[in-house]
Amino acid sequence: MVIPELFSAGLILLLLFITGFVGMKMKIPDVVIFILLGIAVGGLLSGSHLLHFAGEVGIVLLFFMLGMEFPLKQLMSIAKKVLRAGILDVALSFGVTMAICMMMGLDVITSLIIGGVAYATSSSITAKMLESSKRMANPESEFMLGLLIFEDLVAPILVAVLVGLTAGMALTAGSMSLLVVKVVALVAGAVILGVFLFRKLGSFFDRHMKHDLFILFVIGLALMYGGLALYLDLSEVLGAFLAGIMLAEVKRTHELELMVVRFRDLLLPLFFLYFGTTISFSEGIPMIPLLILVLVWSVIAKVIVGVLGGRWYGLTKKVSLRAGLSLTQRGEFSIIIASLAAGSIKAFSSVFILASAMIGILLFQFAPSIANKFYGKKAKTSVKQHVGSA
């Protein structure tokens, strides 16, 4: 007797709830829990097109909502404040990691993928831990969130480049130029629509946002622009993020987020679950020496970015160290990039993500006490505040 898909869908959602609830009680991020669940049930769900599509919609809505947080003027302001730290982050976390992989004998595309996996700190894990540990009011939180936003701007473009390269595009000057043209065209389209169309539709949104039909317009826009990015052989993540930036120009972010958030919360766990089902350890954990090397470097790189970037931002040495130790966990963007890989590289990336998430959680929790051991318990909140009070 064939099990109805409706029953299977309900069972999957209940399993996600149970494992997520257990993870919450154990203070393990739900991202990690859902991936582990996917690995455990991979034999039953592998190759499910419906699960893949539902998860894809979930990740599109995640980055659509992220884009809605940042009107163009705010994006430019944040980018300027953390620009030096952001560039250092790209150079160390992405560039040096890629160089390490190439020195260990990997090809350029594989090295790019692993560098991409090691690049971005998990926004969701970091934000949740800042809130749960009551450190959101600490002086380092503004710098950390600014750096995360910078990564959120860079990472979709990085994903778009990697999507193009893993789709079979040769790494030549011509192919890279074409890729840049596509990205610029997609970004320009979003900026033009945002500034010249959506910025003028505030009254239209006010009149119609409360109608049940309006959610079709909002989510339809996110899916369509994400789909346009896929049509251009770019990433749906970039398209969704840009669609969010478009709607941010309406200046009705809070109301629009309330419309979308429940759909995101329903579908996003399915993305992490599906990713887990695609991971296979049938041949064991590949390239263990390289894995350890990349894992150690990924922690060191983020600490350096936090220490130097925090000082450039105006934080004290102690607060900067606390920030650096709180940035080492990888998550959603690393998973998106890892999903572009195949076979042993996907398994390698998956172990790295899970290990870095767990190490990052521990370092985040012990960051204040470690910083106290280095610099003592009393420290001024920031260089700027100290100068101002003097």
UniProtKB/Swiss-Prot annotation:
Instruction: Please give the knockout or disruption phenotype noted for this protein.
Output: Deletion affects endospore formation and germination.
Topology of this chain in the membrane: Multi-pass membrane protein
GO molecular function annotations of the record = antiporter activity
* Pfam families to which the protein is assigned, alphabetical: Na_H_Exchanger
Gene Ontology cellular component list = plasma membrane
Q: Which residues cross the membrane?
A: 2-22, 31-51, 52-72, 94-114, 143-163, 178-198, 212-232, 266-286, 288-308, 351-371
Which UniProt keyword terms apply here?
Answer: Ammonia transport, Antiport, Cell membrane, Ion transport, Membrane, Transmembrane, Transmembrane helix, Transport
Keyword hit for Cytoplasm: no
UniProt record similarity statement = Belongs to the monovalent cation:proton antiporter 2 (CPA2) transporter (TC 2.A.37) family.
Q: How does it assemble?
A: Interacts with AmhM.
Write the protein's name: Ammonium/H(+) antiporter subunit AmhT
Q: Source taxonomy lineage?
A: Bacteria, Bacillati, Bacillota, Bacilli, Bacillales
Tell me the name of the encoding gene. Answer: amhT
